[in-house]
Design a protein with these regions (language model features):
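Sec-dependent bacterial lipoprotein signal peptides
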Residues: 1-25
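A short, solvent-exposed beta-strand micro-motif common in secreted/extracellular proteins
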Residues: 76-87
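Short acidic/proline- and small/hydrophobic-mixed sequence motifs that coincide with surface turns
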Residues: 42-46, 91
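Intrinsically disordered, low-complexity Pro/Gly/Ser/Thr-rich segments with frequent PxxP/GP/PP motifs
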Residues: 53-75
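Asparagine-centered strand-capping/turn motif at beta-strand->loop junctions
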Residues: 34-41
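Bacterial signal peptide processing site
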Residues: 26-30
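Extracellular beta-sheet/turn segments enriched in Thr/Pro/Gly and aliphatic residues
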Residues: 95-126
Length: 126
């Protein structure tokens, strides 16, 4: 390696590194961080969240516990929650409209009276 080449490499290396960092920053997929928060005194069973184009869930969610999940919205539509309460009765709640490209957080709170509240903090990405 010649001195001239080594000098040019030292001069241009920071420019190359900055270019790679800017490119990497542009590679971002929008995800929704979700928490299902069971604030009731009973264990819930067959907890399922349906959102546009997919679903996720957990077989049981103990009283006063939380379930964390991250998903990507593909398509648009309403999100719903379904679970069986302690007596085995199926409960359903409809949440907010979701649109492809949204990201942020969503908290789904199941209260002591089995009432469900939805707390979305979502924004649309480019």
């Amino acid at each position: 390696m010649t001195r001239r080449f080594a000098h040019r490499l030292r001069c241009f290396l920071p420019v190359i590194v900055m270019g790679l960092l800017v490119t990497a920053e542009g590679c971002h997929s929008p995800f929704v961080q979700t928490i299902i928060d069971n604030q009731s005194d009973a264990t819930l069973k067959l907890v399922e969240v349906d959102y546009p184009s997919a679903s996720f869930g957990v077989e049981t969610l103990a009283a006063h516990s939380k379930y964390h999940y991250r998903f990507k919205i593909q398509g648009s539509g309403t999100i719903t929650l379904q679970f069986a309460d302690a007596s085995g009765k199926l409960q359903t709640s409809t949440g907010p409209e979701l649109s492809e490209g949204q990201e942020g957080s969503l908290q789904i709170i199941i209260g002591r009276d089995r009432q469900v509240s939805w707390k979305p903090v979502l924004r649309t990405t480019k």
